[in-house]
């Protein structure tokens, strides 16, 4: 049921089932672990009878932002479709020519946390309020309405919330410092900013200083590739032949192609394939 929202454990079970059902075209393995020691699973899909060096490697990576659970579902759907339709002549041709590496959840800790509250970062332990206890003032659904609310200071009238100062997040103030939810279960690190290429070049959210208390919601981290999830992903890409890569998100309805940090330069050899990528992106959109 692709309309369902699966837990990370359920996704693990689905991956294992695909690998068990289609052993001739799949291989399931972990490329590393998260801060909370959840596996970063990769389902490799290809015709194993044909040598890997004769094929093009395609990466389908998803859920680097924990709350974007639908991106994981899209990656899982890709794996499901390729395996289910592997007897189809068209799909057979794909698996003869390509090795597809599907990593549906890059941020498993953030994925699980997002069932409590939408959480973009991973769960590197963080002491945001300085009491020497990581995550000592997490959010909680105090009123039991099924939502964790942002709290604003002001009168309960028709004033738009965007015009009111933020008081905190729904929390019983576990640490007793008068600031609600100022040490939540979040690292504040956006792992999509932490790769060692173009690290922190355009860390827009950080530069805007979006904070509650002293918590920056999205930063590039203290240094390039500080997070175990990103270290594992980069090492995987170094060790495998990845010729093309699709990273799946849910933030906007668009298809992005290189380069997002500078304009296209027709005289730059690195940009020779950009017109082709633009054409493919237009077809996908």
Residue ranges of model-derived segments:
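M14 metallocarboxypeptidase catalytic domain recognition
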Residues: 1-285
């Amino acid at each position: 049921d692709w309309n369902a929202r699966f837990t990370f454990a359920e996704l693990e079970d689905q991956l294992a089932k695909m690998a068990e059902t289609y052993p001739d075209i799949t291989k399931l393995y972990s490329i590393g672990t998260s801060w909370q020691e959840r596996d970063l699973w990769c389902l490799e899909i290809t015709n194993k009878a044909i040598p890997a060096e004769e094929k093009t490697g395609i990466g389908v990576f998803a859920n680097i932002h924990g709350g974007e659970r639908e991106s994981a579902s899209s990656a899982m759907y890709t794996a499901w479709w390729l395996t289910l339709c592997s007897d189809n002549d068209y799909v057979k041709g794909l698996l003869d020519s390509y090795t597809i590496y599907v990593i549906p959840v890059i941020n498993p800790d953030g994925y699980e946390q997002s069932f409590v509250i939408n959480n973009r970062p991973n769960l590197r332990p963080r002491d945001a309020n300085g009491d020497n206890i990581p995550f000592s003032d997490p959010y909680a659904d105090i009123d039991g309405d099924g939502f964790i609310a942002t709290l604003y200071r002001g009168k309960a009238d028709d004033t738009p919330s965007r015009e009111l100062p933020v008081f905190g997040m729904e929390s019983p103030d576990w640490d007793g410092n008068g600031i609600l939810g100022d040490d939540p279960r979040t690292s504040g690190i956006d792992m999509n900013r932490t790769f060692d290429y173009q690290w922190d070049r355009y860390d827009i959210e950080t530069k805007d200083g979006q904070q509650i208390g002293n918590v920056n919601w999205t930063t590039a981290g203290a240094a390039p590739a500080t997070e175990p999830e990103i270290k594992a992903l980069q090492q995987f890409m170094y060790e495998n032949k990845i010729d093309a890569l699709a990273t799946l998100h849910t933030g906007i309805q668009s298809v992005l192609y290189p380069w997002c940090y500078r304009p296209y330069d027709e005289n730059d050899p690195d940009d020779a394939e950009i017109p082709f990528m633009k054409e493919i992106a237009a077809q996908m959109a």
